[in-house]
Amino acid sequence: MYLKSLTLKGFKSFASPTTLRFEPGITAVVGPNGSGKSNVVDALAWVMGEQGAKTLRGGKMEDVIFAGTSSRAPLGRAEVTVTIDNSDNALPIEYSEVSITRRMFRDGASEYEINGSSCRLMDVQELLSDSGIGREMHVIVGQGKLDEILQSRPEDRRAFIEEAAGVLKHRKRKEKALRKLDAMSANLARLTDLTTELRRQLKPLGRQAEVARRAQTIQADLRDARLRLAADDLVNRRGEREAIFEAEAAMRREHDEASARLAVASDELAAHEKALGELSGRAESVQQTWFALSALAERVAATVRIASERAQHLDLEPVTTGDTDPDALEAEAERVAAAEQQLLAELATARSRLETARAELAEREREAAEADRAHMAAVRAEADRREGLARLAGQVETMRARVESIDDSVARLSERIEAAAARAQQAKAEFETVQGRVGELDQGEVGLDEHHERTVAALRLADERVAELQAAERDAERKVASLRARIDALAVGLERKDGTAWLTENHSGAGILGPMAKLVKVRSGYEAAVAAVLGSAADALAADGLGAARSALGALKQADGGRAALVLGDWPADPPAPQPAPAGALWALDLIDAPERLRGAITAMLSGVAVVDDLDRALALVAEHPRLRAVTLDGDLVGAGWVSGGSDRKLSTLEVTSEIDKAGAELAAAEAQVAQLSAALSGALAEQAARQDSAEQALAALNESDSAISGMYEQLGRLGQEARTSEDEWSRLLRQREELEAGRTQTVAEVTELENRLRNAQETPQEPAAEPVNRQQIAAATDAARSAEVEARLAVRTAEERANAVRGRADSLRRAAAAEREARVRAQQAREARLRAAAVAAAVADSGRLLATRLNAVVAAASRIRDALAAERQQRATAMAAVRDEVNALSARVAALTDSLHSDEVANAQAALRIEQLEQMVLEQFGMAPADLIAEYGPHIALPPSELEMAEYEQAKERGEQVFAPAPIPFDRPTQERRAKRAERELAELGRVNPLALEEFAALEERYNFLSTQLEDVKAARKDLLGVVDEVDARILQVFSEAYTDVEREFSDVFGVLFPGGEGRLRLTDPSNMLTTGIEVEARPPGKKITRLSLLSGGEKALTAVAMLVAIFRARPSPFYIMDEVEAALDDTNLRRLISLFELLRARSQLIIITHQKPTMEVADALYGVTMQGDGITAVISQRMRGQQVDQLVTT
């Protein structure tokens, strides 16, 4: 087995498909650094299942895909295929050549193939592990692998030997067994808990099963006794049947008379039906008219309410205007204008005084300056002459230029001051105008707020009215639905599935008058009491005499239609003698209204029955009058020596019919209420829509006013800010001008002084002046003039401020007066418009009230017409129902008379009815046909011995006693009755019996036995798995021990070759535990006493690691080895020694060596040259060294 070829497509730097063909021996791969030699090693490791990106010298696994260059785009996948020659069957697969392919895509997906078939990574690893190539890839010695071997933990070094020895598959088998053991432990604990719990439950359930078994025996005995009693009853009733015959001629005469009466009644019924149809159409039309008028009345009422509220609102809403009188504002404006003129005059006077004070001050300052100059002239005359006239002249020009600059600045500031004052005045005027408009809008806002609140309140009332009517309508509709459902449910209760229903559907014309519930009427509230007294007769059919009843029973029997109760018409009965009812009671006969033909039967059934309130009164009444029967309103019936009642009583047909009638009356009233509420709701919805529109309009007007006021306030803020800014600028500019004027005064004084000095210097002789000037008097006069000038300037400032304060105030007041007049005109116009609107609303309200009055009268008239038509229709329907009942009764009578020709069958039918009831009871309770019952349990059948007697007999026979077999016992009714009671008593003594105990016990016992078997199976399986683990441990121990022994021996030999005279050996860290022990490496090169591997040189470490790998290779050879620059750190001597080992390995394995060393190339059988041009893509060429011939082994 050896590597035949390696194909790379898009793997790392191999952008183009490249195939490297190998042969046995040593193959050297050479090339410059960075050309992609190690990528060949990475490709081999990757295709054989390597999963570590760092092992492949990358950050993530996707880094193996060609990333592209400046001239080549990146690829989307990487693919590597290695082909292995398997002619020696080293791999456990039936192919002489095996190809393994691995692909990776940019999205991280991977694919594996073996000979073109998809497979898993595990399949690849298991295939290679059997040939000594495990997941650790010890056959691939990459860069840094030598250091890793020596620096790894002893346990990691053990993994190299285990992989070479093929221990991995045994460890996988052990791990799999241990995982199964872990899972099995949970199942074993669960099974143990279940069996323990089932064992605990079996004992009490067994006791319950024994009780159930005993109950079955007693129940069988009880069933036998009851069956024999039922068979005796059936035989006795069959002997009671008799036949009665009536005269046929009398029946025929009565039949002809009834037929004539039936024809007359049928014609009358047709006339009633026609008239009722016409009345129904008229009533429906009137009902629709009433509904439309009611809705219109509700809408008119809503319109009246809205118009009344609007008129009241318009009358009460005040029209607000400003509180200021425009004439007063104009008078104030005139007064302010006069004050402004006076202030301007005062300002002119103050300015005139200021000019005089300034002239006086200038004169005094001039005199003072002349005095100073005269005083200083003599002192500085000589100095000034020495300083030179040129410098003084320059200073004079400079100071004059400064004065001119100050004059220009003052002029500009004066212009800016006037502009700022004008802007401030304009902003104040606009502010006052806008402020007046804001006041007007605020006054109008109050009215809009009030109007909006009123419209919202009106809308809320309309919403509440609509919600109230909708809730009432829903309640009424729910009531209608509930009543209809109740009527339907009660009608379902009237649908019978017994003989009564069969007779009604199939035999109604043969003497059957109809159900008793429809033929009789009971006073409201007494239905339950009368139904309790009538019993089954309350649900019975009325038959037209004895013959009709006989015929009906015969038809039932023939058709097997079930059982039915019949009340006989024209039954002879003497009316009871009138007597007062007992105190607190009513006679039952007085509470029922029945047709005359049924009066006899009703009298027979209800005679002597009194109706009382409660059971105590009934018991007391019967105790006082034993001949009477008493019944309570709840249906409890009391007689002499007996009481019947309770709560488990179903409603009779009579009661159900009465309930249907009551529900029908309530349904009609509820439907009328729904119609009234619908009409009212229609009008309320119209009112709600109108008030919704009013509220939305009021809200829109309010929002518009709010927007206008907000805009005005924003404008006020802007104008106020502009006024304040202008005033601040005016004040600031005034201060700047005053400062400049003060500086100008000082500069002018300096200029004057310099000019005087210059003039004195030019004119004054060298001798000083003869006489000084009186300077003190001049200085005092100057100070007085300066004080007067300051006071005059302050007076001008004060006058200017007062004038500015009132400037434009008169114009503002005049504009406010004009605005107030306009507001008053608009208010008057609004007042007149509201008055007109109020008049219109009042007129609408009055007209609406008049229309509402008329509509109410029309609605009332329509209601009366509707009620009259309804009453007439009800009367017509009642009359038609009476005629229909008469027609039905006559039809039944005619049919009954026809069938009554066979009246002799009535007695037999009555007996048959009783027998059928008994047979039905036997069939329902015991599931036996009457014939089988009599044949097996009839009175003629003797009773067999009981199980107890037979058991005693068998025991006596077993004891050898001379006994006779128990003889059958003849039937005896009292004995069977006692037998049945005894069985019932024994069954009651058993208490509560679990009928499913026998089945539950059997099922639980079966489950317990099954789980016990499963538990034993799991224990056995666990024992087998533990045996597998022990077996695998033993196999691992054996394989590892043998491999370690061989590797240890080979390591000593290989170390001696690489280090002649040196000593190296392998040592186990824990020899007592060969399953987990690690492996330490001890190496002592010749002439050195080293105890730690870290003290070895780099070359010595590399040789030591190579020695261990070669020892493993020789002890457990692998088909091929790949080495990546393992000899890079060796000198020539050690390299030759290593090459000698390569030549030894070449004999049994294929070597692929990445190298830069020439000696290594010399021993190679083939050379592969790997290059990389400027495009970053690897290219490969090859050279076969043996035979000095060149073969092309690479396809690119």
UniProtKB/Swiss-Prot annotation:
ATP binds at P32, N33, G34, S35, G36, K37, S38, N39. Residues 168-288, 327-497, 654-829, 972-1026 form a coiled coil. GO terms for cellular component: chromosome; cytoplasm. GO terms for biological process: chromosome condensation; chromosome segregation; DNA replication; sister chromatid cohesion. It comes from the Bacteria. Its main location: cytoplasm. InterPro entries: P-loop_NTPase, RecF/RecN/SMC_N, SMC, SMC_hinge, SMC_hinge_sf, SMC_prok. Gene3D superfamilies: 1.20.1060.20, 3.30.70.1620, P-loop containing nucleotide triphosphate hydrolases. Keywords: ATP-binding, Coiled coil, Cytoplasm, DNA-binding, Nucleotide-binding. GO terms for molecular function: ATP binding; ATP hydrolysis activity; DNA binding. Pfam families: SMC_hinge, SMC_N. Required for chromosome condensation and partitioning. HAMAP family: Smc_prok. Homodimer. This is Chromosome partition protein Smc.
